């Protein structure tokens, strides 16, 4: 195969991606398949970091809308991401990988604190780093956490796995004539009001010139194909 197009990546997975066909929790078969994908990418020579959402367990913003204090809800959501990170760590380690979970909030008996230089060192030593608890602050999504961590570790590419296979001009689930974009600039996304990620995360990525690829991860081997330069999903980078 060809040389890798990206040396260091951060993959953002939604918590819902771990549910499979269920409506709550973690499907062992799904997390095992995702772990195989990640290890395949690392064995090809990439340094791989992960951020996983917590929506399969708890979504703070949702309960805040029902009356719960937003800060409390967001803290509960952060803990949900730690649960998912530990589950992924277990799945990866069972396949022989060396993994470190690093949290933005202190849970020292469970995982490491996030320290930027240590995170980079883990990657350089061939370990997979899983960043949990978002940014450690309420009112910020795990998309923002993923963008922030990707910038901090100097990732060559931020990958966001979604339920659809890229960015469309309109909702492909509602419109059969929806058109998928192969590439976009950050300015085009703003001007066309396209849904890529939340505003804070998008601004971080744009201002740091961080390439972002939106793609679907349902097809086996897709992550490795992206690393080898295949144009899968939608690439967002640069300005108009």
From Swiss-Prot:
Its main location: cytoplasm. UMP binds at residues 54, 74, 135-142. The keyword Cytoplasm applies. One of its GO terms (molecular function) is UMP kinase activity. Keywords: ATP-binding, Cytoplasm, Kinase, Nucleotide-binding, Pyrimidine biosynthesis, Transferase. Its EC number is 2.7.4.22. GO terms for biological process: 'de novo' CTP biosynthetic process; UDP biosynthetic process. SUPFAM superfamilies: Carbamate kinase-like. One of its GO terms (cellular component) is cytosol. It is found in: Cytoplasm. Pathway: Pyrimidine metabolism; CTP biosynthesis via de novo pathway; UDP from UMP (UMPK route): step 1/1. ATP binds at residues 12-15, 55, 59, 162, 168, 171. Inhibited by UTP. It catalyses: UMP + ATP = UDP + ADP. Homohexamer. Catalyzes the reversible phosphorylation of UMP to UDP. NCBIfam families: pyrH_bact (TIGR02075). HAMAP family: PyrH_B. Belongs to the UMP kinase family. This is Uridylate kinase. It comes from Xanthomonas oryzae pv. oryzae (strain KACC10331 / KXO85).
């Amino acid at each position: 195969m060809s040389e890798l197009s990206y040396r260091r990546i951060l993959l953002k997975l939604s918590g819902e991606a771990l549910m499979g066909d269920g409506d709550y929790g973690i499907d062992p078969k799904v997390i095992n398949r995702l772990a195989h994908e990640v290890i395949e990418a690392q064995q090809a020579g990439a340094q791989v970091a992960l951020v996983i959402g917590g929506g399969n367990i708890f979504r703070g913003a949702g309960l805040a809308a029902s009356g719960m204090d937003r800060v409390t809800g967001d803290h509960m959501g952060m803990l949900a991401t730690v649960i998912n990170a530990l589950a992924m760590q277990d799945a990866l380690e069972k396949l022989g990988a060396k993994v470190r979970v690093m949290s933005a909030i202190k849970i020292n008996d469970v995982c490491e604190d996030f320290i930027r230089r240590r995170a980079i060192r883990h990657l350089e030593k061939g370990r997979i780093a899983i960043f949990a608890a978002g940014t450690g602050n309420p009112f910020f999504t795990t998309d923002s956490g993923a963008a922030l961590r990707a910038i901090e570790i100097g990732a060559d590419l931020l990958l966001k796995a979604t339920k659809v296979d890229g960015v469309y001009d309109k909702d492909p689930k509602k419109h059969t004539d929806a058109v998928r974009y192969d590439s976009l600039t950050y300015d085009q996304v703003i001007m066309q009001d396209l849904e890529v990620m939340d505003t804070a995360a998008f601004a971080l990525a744009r201002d740091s010139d961080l390439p972002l690829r939106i793609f679907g991860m349902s097809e086996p081997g897709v992550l490795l194909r992206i690393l080898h330069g295949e144009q899968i999903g939608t690439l967002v980078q640069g300005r108009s």
